[in-house]
UniProtKB/Swiss-Prot annotation:
The lineage of its organism: Eukaryota, Metazoa, Chordata, Craniata, Vertebrata. Residues 1-32 form the signal peptide. Residues 941-1005 form the SAM domain. Residues 33-591 are extracellular. It comes from Mus musculus. Gene3D superfamilies: ephrin a2 ectodomain, Galactose-binding domain-like, Immunoglobulins, Phosphorylase Kinase, domain 1, Transcription Factor, Ets-1, Transferase(Phosphotransferase) domain 1, Tumor Necrosis Factor Receptor, subunit A, domain 2. This is Ephrin type-B receptor 6.
Length: 1014
């Protein structure tokens, strides 16, 4: 009998075909391995399995279906048995070691005779047999062998043949298969496969039960499935036994990353430290359900698909773990060795800590160029140009080093100098400057300094060399004059502009002359021109017609030039227009003649207008004039858009149509009654880009709204003045309909002033009012009445130039404009230039009060009563008397006694030239004495502390200042003077004036009998 070791060898074969064990089948499976536990296929020697009862199964040698001799177990005891005789023949294998298998598979080769061919009737013949198994930790001993068939067996299945074969008629003994004369032929076989488990003990037995069949068991093969070892996703997975549960059950196998690989992060991306990869082996020995994987470490790239990670070659790198190829080294870097995670920079070049590895190496910048400065009293504005070489970076910054020197020396003679005192300060800061200028303050007069400007960037600290720098020797004097506060236009022509300005507020000596700098706004400011004037007036000639020019002026004393004042912009007249100032020497006779001719011509045109009025319905705008006169005689006119049936026709004649492709629309900056207002850019072909404000008409608006919208644009397009909002163009041929005007960055004048309370001198506020008055003088020359003049209808640009807007606004039904309305407007609805003068006076009060609401919180009826009783607004805190007197002139009840706008402009010019006139308190003998309104009086009995008093007057921001300096009673506050306020931290001029005004009221209250001190 052959031993079990010879029949159940541990050899392994690939199921189905001969192929590589490492073949990875994409899509989740690999061919399974069969771990053979027992195999009788082709066995020729005695097998020796146990049978019961003896003779129930016979072990014989027969030819198989390949005509090979093989050992076979046969059972066929149905012939000759009486009906009803039962069969119970058992065949048991030897003890089979499971060898780690969790489930066993059995493959049976057998043949069954057909009962019909045996001539057996009744139920004694079967064509099936039953398969069993039982587990054991040890082989059966001698005592157990005798009763093996009585042990507890587990049924696997009843095995039925797919085909049964007839009995051979020529064979005297039992035979299976067709008969050939003179020899035994090969068997015809069925093949069945079953599995059982899970297996938990050392081994098992398999048994076959025959209950009345005629069959031959030709071959038995017991095996288990194993998933082979594989390389997948840069990880190796070991050989793994299939699950004992079979079917879809899975066994997880943990993989090991190949050399120079690491587990992938559990999340998306990230560094090393993820869970090891896993594959799952199913019950048929096939890999599936991959979880995770490995990735090549920094400095390594994939090779042979996803099997290996190899080092990056010289001159390349890979900074992060991942399965991407290496990259060539960035500019100015090189990796001399393989497996580089980053390419080191070449000598003289660096990477900042914030630079990624893929960034090119960069260097420090070169030194700044062309340092120069402008002295501003004890301070100076230091300028420089950008370095020639930026080092390949965009994070350029500047540091300023200040050295105070004991004597005059070159910048290189640092041994004589020391670090500047702490009193020297820098605005906006000393280090990390982003712009090429800095204001240096706190310098001592007549002390030589060296200012050094260093250029640095993100890699300057990595360089062993100090930052490249440029230095300049500077010295300041307190005696230079201060800045000229304001400048205004006296007259203009097509090729010239005459400007005038007041003396600096601090002359610090005798003014020797003034230096005027000017440039064309259409060109770069660096192309500016200068001229010198010994007076405070200058005429600039050789200018281009219709161009806008920027002007600045500074004064010079023996100590040197003071700083330039702010930029102011004026425009020359278009070619062919008359000068804005008539020659002073014009003959009275010529003037009389021209006046007579103008009167006659006006009368003639008026008669013609009446005659043809009925015939002009729908005619061109050029025939419908608000005032009829000849422009050749210097009398101006404008066209009233409301007389047009089609506002688009007026737009075509009076405004420039803009191609929408030239417009770039940006963010929303506001909204009006017609639609949103957006910031934008306009760049017609061949012209410089300019910032504009774009108002688009609401979609779906009424036709009347569109007519009003376009009518206002047509009106605005007729006026060209530096202090009137400029129309840049319109879009009417596409949707939405848009109106483009110049951009006024600082918005309405009232809100602008409220946000900057106390930040301007009286002269600067006068200059703002002068600009508005000049615009109204220009409009009144056209007999145009604004009707809605107020601080909110005036816009301010970034150069503090005030421009009148909202032309054509209809105030009818708008009670909100009552506070600016003249008495005749309130009572009779009569709008004239004189009513605009009244409104301008209210605007003056708004300016001097920094945007305070006229008449404060009085309701409309109270305002009407006050005006009717001839009460007038009092001077705002800090308002010069001369300005308030001018306001009172504009508020004369008799409109004929109010000044004209040209008189107001002349008054402002006089104040600017001679600032002492602002303080003049004398009045005209013709001016009636007018009662002045007071703001809402403070309820002193309800104010229990200086802190409550500060809140009542709107200066609660200084409550901590009062507490810090022990101002706890009204008596303490009443003793404060102007000199005390800076020491309390109250430096804004407007706040100082407001506080002093209310201190005076407080003093009056404390002097009253019965007042209680708190």
């Amino acid at each position: 009998m052959a031993t079990e070791g010879t029949t159940g060898s541990g050899s392994r074969v690939v199921a189905g075909m001969v192929c590589s064990l490492w073949l990875l089948v994409l899509g989740s499976s690999v061919l399974a391995l069969e771990e053979v536990l027992l195999d009788t296929t082709g066995e020729t020697s005695e097998i020796g399995w146990l049978t019961y009862p003896p003779g129930g199964w016979d072990e014989v040698s027969v030819l198989d279906d390949q005509r090979r001799l093989t050992r076979t177990f046969e059972a066929c005891h149905v012939a000759g048995l009486p009906p009803g005789s039962g069969q119970d023949n058992w065949l048991q294998t030897h003890f089979v070691e499971r060898r780690g298998a969790q489930r066993a598979h059995i493959r049976l080769h057998f043949s069954v005779r057909a009962c019909s061919s045996l001539g057996v009737s009744g139920g004694t013949c079967r064509e099936t047999f039953t398969l069993y198994y039982r587990q054991a930790d040890e082989p059966d001993g001698p005592d157990s062998i005798a009763a093996w068939h009585l042990k507890r067996w587990t049924k696997v299945d009843t095995i039925a043949a797919d085909e049964s074969f007839p009995a051979s008629s020529s064979s005297s003994s039992w035979a299976v298969g067709p008969h050939r004369t003179g020899q035994r032929v090969g068997l015809q076989l069925n093949v069945k496969e079953r599995s059982f488990g899970p297996l938990t003990q050392r081994g098992f037995y398999v048994a076959f039960q025959d209950t009345g069949a005629c069959l031959a068991l030709v071959a038995v093969k017991l095996f288990s499935y194993t998933c082979p070892s594989v390389l997948r996703a840069f990880a190796s997975f070991p050989e793994t036994q299939a699950s004992g549960a079979g079917g879809a059950s899975l066994v997880a196998a943990v993989g090991t990353c190949v050399a120079h690989a690491e587990p992938e992060e559990d999340g998306v991306g990230g560094q090393a430290g993820g869970s090891p990869p896993r594959l799952h082996c199913n019950g048929e020995g096939r890999w599936m359900v991959a979880v995770g994987g490995c990735r090549c470490q920094p400095g390594h790239q994939p090779a042979r698909g996803d099997k290996l990670c190899q080092a990056c070659p010289e001159g390349s790198y890979k900074a992060l773990a991942g399965n991407v190829p290496c990259s060539p080294c960035p500019a100015r870097s090189h990796s001399p060795d393989p497996a580089a995670p980053v390419c080191p920079c070449l000598q003289g070049f660096y990477r900042a800590s914030s630079d990624p590895p893929e960034a090119p190496c960069t260097g420090p910048p070169s030194a700044p160029r062309e340092l120069w400065f402008e002295v501003q009293g004890s301070a100076l504005m230091l300028h420089w140009r950008l370095p020639q070489e930026l080092g390949g970076r965009g994070d350029l910054l500047f540091n300023v080093v200040c050295k105070e020197c004991g004597g005059h020396g070159e910048p290189s003679s640092g041994g004589m100098c020391r670090r500047c005192r702490d009193e020297v300060h820098f605005d906006p800061r000393q280090r990390g400057l982003t712009e090429s200028r800095v204001l240096v303050g706190g310098l001592r007069a007549h002390v030589p300094y060296i200012l050094e400007v260093q250029a640095v960037n993100g890699v300057s600290e990595l360089s062993p060399d100090p930052p490249q720098a440029a230095a300049i020797n500077v010295s300041t004097s307190h005696e230079v004059p201060s800045a000229v506060p304001v400048m205004h236009q006296v007259s203009r022509a097509a090729n010239s502009i005459t400007v005038s300005w007041p003396q600096p507020e601090q002359t610090n000596g005798n003014i020797l002359d003034y230096q005027l700098r000017y440039y064309d706004q259409a060109e770069d400011e660096s192309h500016s021109f200068t001229m010198t004037s010994e007076t405070n007036t200058a005429t600039v000639t050789r200018l281009s017609p219709g161009h806008i020019y920027g002007f600045q002026v500074r004064a010079r004393t023996a100590a040197g030039h003071g700083p330039y004042g702010g930029k102011v912009y004026f425009q020359t007249l278009p070619q062919g227009e008359l000068s804005s100032q008539l020659p002073e020497k014009l003959s009275l006779v010529i003037g009389s003649i021209l006046g007579a001719l103008a009167f006659l011509l006006l009368a003639a045109i008026t008669v013609l207008a009446v005659i043809f009025q009925r015939k002009r319905r729908g005619t061109g705008y050029t025939e419908q004039l608000q005032q009829y006169s000849s422009p050749g005689l210097g009398v101006k006119y404008y066209i009233d858009p409301s007389t047009y049936d089609d506002p688009c026709q007026a737009i075509r004649e009076l405004a420039r149509e803009v191609d929408p492709t030239y417009i770039k629309i940006e963010e929303v900056i506001g909204a009006g009654s017609f639609g949103e207002v957006r910031r934008g850019r306009l760049q017609p072909r061949g012209r410089r880009e300019q910032a504009v404000a774009i108002q688009a008409l609401w979609a779906g608006g009424a036709e009347s709204l569109k007519m009003t919208f376009l009518g206002r644009a047509a009106l605005l397009g007729q006026f060209q003045h530096p202090n009137i909002l400029r129309l840049e163009g319109v879009v009417t041929k596409s949707r939405p309909v848009m109106v483009l005007t110049e951009l006024m960055e600082l918005g309405p004048l009232d809100s602008f002033l409220r946000q900057r309370e106390g930040q301007f001198s009286s002269l600067q506020l006068v200059a703002m009012q002068r600009g508005v008055a000049a615009a109204m003088q220009y409009l009144s020359s056209f007999a145009f009445v604004h009707r809605a003049l107020s601080a909110r209808s005036v816009l301010v640009n970034s150069h503090l130039v005030c421009k009148v807007a909202r032309l054509g606004h209809s105030p009818q039904g708008s009670s909100s404009l009552l506070r600016w309305a003249a008495p005749e407007v309130i009572t009779h609805g009569k709008y004239t230039t004189s009513s605009d003068v009244w409104s301008f006076g209210i605007l003056m009060w708004e300016v001097m009060s920094y945007g305070e609401r006229p008449y404060w919180d009085m309701n409309e009826q109270e305002v009407l009563n006050a005006i009717e009783q001839e009460f007038r607004l009092p001077p705002p805190p800090g308002c010069p008397p001369g300005l308030h007197l001018l306001m009172l002139d504009t508020w004369q009840k008799d409109r004929a006694r109010r000044p004209h706008f040209d008189q107001l402009v002349a008054a402002f010019d006089k104040m600017i030239r001679k600032p002492d006139t602002l303080q003049a308190e004398g009045g005209s003998g013709d001016r009636p004495s007018q009662a002045l309104l007071n703001p809402v009086a403070l309820d002193f009995p309800c104010l229990d502390s200086p802190q409550a008093w500060l809140s009542a007057i709107g200066l609660e921001c200084y409550q901590d200042n009062f507490s810090k300096f022990g101002l706890s009673t009204f008596s303490d506050v009443a003793q404060l003077s102007l000199e005390d306020l800076p020491g309390l931290g109250i430096t804004l001029a407007g706040h100082q004036k407001k506080l002093l005004h209310n201190i005076q009221l407080l003093q009056q209250h404390l002097r009253q009998p019965g007042s209680v001190e708190v």
